[in-house]
Amino acid sequence: MAKLDAYFGEYGGQYVPQILVPALDQLEQAFIDAQADPEFRSEFMTLLQEYAGRPTALTLTRNLTKGTKTKLYLKREDLLHGGAHKTNQVLGQALLAKRMGKQEIIAETGAGQHGVATALACALLGLKCRVYMGAKDVERQSPNVFRMKLMGAEVIPVHSGSSTLKDACNEALRDWSATYEDAHYLLGTAAGPHPFPTIVRDFQRMIGEETKNQILAREGRLPDAVIACVGGGSNAIGMFADFIEEESVRLIGVEPAGKGIDTDQHGAPLKHGKTGIFFGMKAPLMQDENGQVEESYSVSAGLDFPSVGPQHAHLNAIGRAEYDNVTDDEALEAFQLIARKEGIIAALESSHALAHAVKMAHDDPEKEQLLVVNLSGRGDKDIFSVHDILKEKGAL
């Protein structure tokens, strides 16, 4: 029986209760079989094109890098049906679940984008859907909560722990432990127990594949760097995957520095965490001196995660990708900047990557460079929270 690698270097693996091992084995084999089946691939690609709206545009910014020699392109995952890159892999996993004969889908969500994507895929494919969401996130993402309910999903607020994404993840896994015979756990990021990091990456890798073709058609060469925000890491690994072998292309992931890396309110485990076991995997993790999981923090709910996908950890360890961080204030500034300069309302998550790219351009205005930012989602979900933050700062 064919098997996928469970580890990326020392990271990854399958640290789960024994009861879940058969379910994960079944999922791995189903994924291997599906990837080898032209009919499955064809149905997936048809849904991406005709339902989700792929390929997404590659947009050259007109004003963000004025006064510099940088050309900055945006990969427009915000234009995808559902409003973010999440729709790509959700359609893939939902098709896989149907192929496995599952009737129900369990999901977790932070910003609500994965929950919305899961709800729309379940509505389309006739699957029952329940979504676990931290109670804090339910409050700060009420438009997405209503969207999910509108599409027939049951939204279950999680009040344990910090009432955020990590707690929703734990509850979703607990549910799956009891229901895996009928239910598929549709994990929302390129993290968690094997084979999820590989499945999610492969169902997101068209982001980088399209970007490569589009930039070659437009510029006749590969970019100097591709830049993406990193929470769990699915939009970033989707962008990076097709460029890993292209050694001339820098892969830059941007973690949330929150209120500052020197505070305890950030979400940057790659640079400031220690290796631990969390969410069924071995990965960098924000921990206190006793090894307890620390609460992460970010202004963007989708980056508020105390760990990171194992492939990012490996790419960081071997020096193939580099990871920096951006504070809440810098992301908020970029959120406003792209709206004013380009007429695009970007997600707060994506605004972290954008802030880093704009800084790269203006730090060295004479340097000729070709940059691509993965604009992973649109910011409609964030306008109310940003309005309140700016009002509080007296910036409105």
Swiss-Prot record:
Pathway: Amino-acid biosynthesis; L-tryptophan biosynthesis; L-tryptophan from chorismate: step 5/5. It is an enzyme of class 4 (lyase). The keyword Transport does not apply. Its EC number is 4.2.1.20. NCBIfam families: trpB (TIGR00263). Its cofactor is pyridoxal 5'-phosphate. One of its GO terms (cellular component) is cytoplasm. It catalyses: (1S,2R)-1-C-(indol-3-yl)glycerol 3-phosphate + L-serine = D-glyceraldehyde 3-phosphate + L-tryptophan + H2O. Coiled coil: none annotated. The gene is trpB. CDD domains: Trp-synth_B. The lineage of its organism: Bacteria, Pseudomonadati, Pseudomonadota, Gammaproteobacteria, Vibrionales. PROSITE patterns: TRP_SYNTHASE_BETA (PS00168). It comes from Vibrio atlanticus (strain LGP32) (Vibrio splendidus (strain Mel32)). The keyword Lyase applies. The beta subunit is responsible for the synthesis of L-tryptophan from indole and L-serine. InterPro entries: Trp_synth_b_CS (IPR006653), Trp_synth_beta (IPR006654), Trp_synth_beta/beta-like (IPR023026), TrpB-like_PALP (IPR001926), TrpB-like_PALP_sf (IPR036052). This is Tryptophan synthase beta chain. Gene3D superfamilies: 3.40.50.1100. Tetramer of two alpha and two beta chains.
